[in-house]
């Protein structure tokens, strides 16, 4: 007796992001096993990330064989003059198109590129462990060294922030347990006025810890150790009223530049994964939430690789883009960027996550116009368009293996109906495989191509449907083979056009019981 042809629909494939932590069988089909060079677009679909445009023209000449630009800061003076500072190859630069070295104090030697650049009170301050702090007055390209009378000289600290009307610094080469603060509105004075410091050795809840990072959040000064977080109130007048309000034990920050504020949350990397410190104004409580639980094993493997290769975590960078509604966490050694969609958490508290490859960022900065700029080996690039420096890049989506809730039957796939948004002139490959194989059957086709005579491509919608200049592509692809579980994948060579996966319809016959 002939079996009835069934239609199986994967609506919004990958909508829930990657999940490599849970068992794939029985997992919601809206999860993906692979979503590389993808974002969750504004309509909740998996789509291609944007590309990048190289802006710097003299990168190789000034950056040599170094890691490239490792940090970027846009400074806007009170006179409304914009200066972009960046650092790499043991140099500090101004400019974007042409990187021009700043003038350093006579005899000043830079040995690392792990600068913390801070805009404060119409000046830019430069802090790095083992280096005397520097200042650019009102955006000047001539930097001077911070000096102070007395014994309390400006700390040569790895971490520094601006908050509560002053600068705060911690983590020097010889002291990782003291937090220093400058005088009010004077980032150059660390000795007189209202400057001061606090020793945290008796404050940590679980014995000795080391300061890694600091942040101002919800009216508190947060001090992040490697294993604990200290919450201080009264930072507006620290010499008189700095008070330990709360401690969060067992979770700290292990990468200074992973800390990013989203306005309502504070995101940071810990030994347990990527964490969110949620803001509740009424109670001023600070609950923790692991937002990387769906990929925790993969993320921690990237972290381990970073430590094994470099012996530290300084190269790990994070950034929050409000206009794109994502948080990026880059691991240079494994050449992967995790892209977390921060619009809303999933039911388990995790954020939807995709990955990026081939970008290889060394630093991030979001400018005043909300544009995302990235430091790379060859200079400064802008996150924009759908080419990587005029070169195509590959977007990859693969489902988790699924039995379509009929575990006892063989599945004979007959035809795929795809609904793709965008994708003009995009070379695309449909993949399908059975029973956990990594060897997929493939069908290639190109949207916008006049040639549709490839095997298995039975119908091709060349006109599509248009809405606000976005084309809707609906190719239909014949398929073969059978198995008990099925994996589906789409690979697309992004070619200067957006590409989002709306829906995958599968026509299948259910066979005998296994």
Language-model segment annotations:
Residues 138-162:
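Asp-box/WD-like beta-propeller blade repeats and closely related beta-sheet repeat scaffolds
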Residues 131, 173-176, 273-275, 379:
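Short glycine/acidic-enriched loop and turn motifs that connect beta-strands
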Residues 66, 154, 206-209, 253:
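Short loop/turn positions that demarcate and connect the beta-strands within blades
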Residues 55-63, 100-107, 143-150, 198-204, ...:
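A short beta-strand motif characteristic of beta-propeller blades
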Residues 221-248:
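Surface-exposed extracellular loop regions of Gram-negative outer-membrane beta-barrel proteins
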Residues 162-187:
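Carboxylate/His-rich catalytic cores and anion/metal-binding grooves
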Residues 92-100, 133-146, 178-200, 233-241, ...:
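Surface-exposed loop/turn elements that mediate protein-protein interactions on large endomembrane-trafficking
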Residues 1-97, 103, 108-122, 250-265, ...:
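Beta-sheet repeat architectures centered on beta-propellers
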